[in-house]
């Protein structure tokens, strides 16, 4: 330990420095996507919560005229100006195709200096498997980031004195790196973007598949699987980068006016502004609602124009008889049926084990049933609310739960920033150094957008970029509930009542008929659905290709059906099998994801009418090949986001 290489210096725990892990954190076997793990380290939790926020740099500018700011007063007035450009441009660099993955770099550094044990490989394989079975969303990214740090510290902190705690605060790692590694590009995947495909496979050209070309009788090829997948990855990362860059426009407006004061933004003035001094006047400027029509970067425009060819090369249908989504739907139906049978059998066992049924009431019977069917993933409900409350996904005014969660998040991030900014600023990566000065602070009103999948703040038609319902898919009880909820909407009326107008009555029925008792969450599910809003529910269940892809990607067997920590031997065997097989493939082909990313990008950067018409036609054909029925793509493109 005395001769550790300098490349690991940033991760070496200083003498007397606390890493935040509670006692017994590393004693139990690791179970991926376990809510209990989040309670092992409050410091890391708050660090990731801070990292989910963009950092704005404040400055004071003189007001030159009354036209600059309404009611600004005399010439001596000053305006607090806040800019996000510095932070956003630095963060967006993660999505450059030729930029090294920092998660891979950390893994390589640890491998070269310490070696990677079989036990570590088993834990890492478990995390990768869970990420592949999860919908790419804010909650999944937060969990992956926390548990990646956990398994690295579990295996290397005690023996080698290296920790990844504080690496996000110092920007040695970012949530964008986690998203890129585990969800967007998937550096550990082995399928070349198509389930069943090998990463080193040479793909036969689709248009001439089966034909012999030339005298030598060779097949025409579309290219190597890795090359074709890299083209898709470029499209997805370029779209994400462009959507993220729209945030840089939000910091261009003045936020506060101070009459006749000559003060630095640092020090007491920030506290006075936060406390609401009487001398300030807020500028009436709305920046987070329906966004302006942004201009699409030229390189992205070219990539989007070629999305169809990109998608064809990484689409499943041309290589298999059954589409990836059709198989996923069949597997989901089987799992739901098996779970219902299992739940019925356990309920029957509860009744049979009761010696005298007359001496216990229905609530006691229900308690025994829930004890047998306890869903450990229910703990993620609070995390979903903490991350999305107060954003367009769950507005504060929608429910008291959302209001309180947003308040707690803002207070937590604000306090953590004040307590740790100086510490982080001393060792922060050079690219982010300007964002850690006295004049900088997290943008609490913008919220944790850096952890969302699409990373823009535009809201439209009662919807926003991050879908609350997609985040709830990580919870087994809610995954099952949403399937039943959708069926109830479809079967609500035998007449031709629109699906949109069936949502509110079904929500009311779920609330009044006691479905909350069946879910065992005291009505939280219905409250969250109400918070999301009718439009967001409609978009998620019936309209949005991205939501459809996330639903298909969510693998209940991978997420919920595995040994737990009480079965040590079975759990160890399960993880060892994952690591030894080295078989990590997505449930949904990259062709469908290419469509989804193009669709979401066109919602923010609308194409010309001719290009839009061609896109809707081609997108409809791809969705039909995947047996996905959605309502009016052109409507969703223009009305929702």
Swiss-Prot record:
Binding site for Zn(2+) 2: 467, 470, 540, 547
Molecular functions per Gene Ontology: zinc ion binding
A family per Pfam: Herpes_env
Keyword presence, Metal-binding: yes
Sites where the protein binds Zn(2+) 1: 101, 104, 181, 187
Biological role: Plays a role in efficient localization of neo-synthesized capsids to nuclear replication compartments, thereby controlling cleavage and packaging of virus genomic DNA.
GO cellular component labels: host cell cytoplasm; host cell nucleus; viral envelope
Spans annotated as Zinc finger 1: 101-187
Claim: Metal-binding is one of the keywords in the record: yes
InterPro entries per record: Herpes_env (IPR002597)
Organism superkingdom: Viruses
Main location: host cell
Gene: MDV046
Protein name: Packaging protein UL32 homolog
Residue span of region Zinc finger 2: 467-547
Subcellular location(s) of the protein: Host cytoplasm; Host nucleus
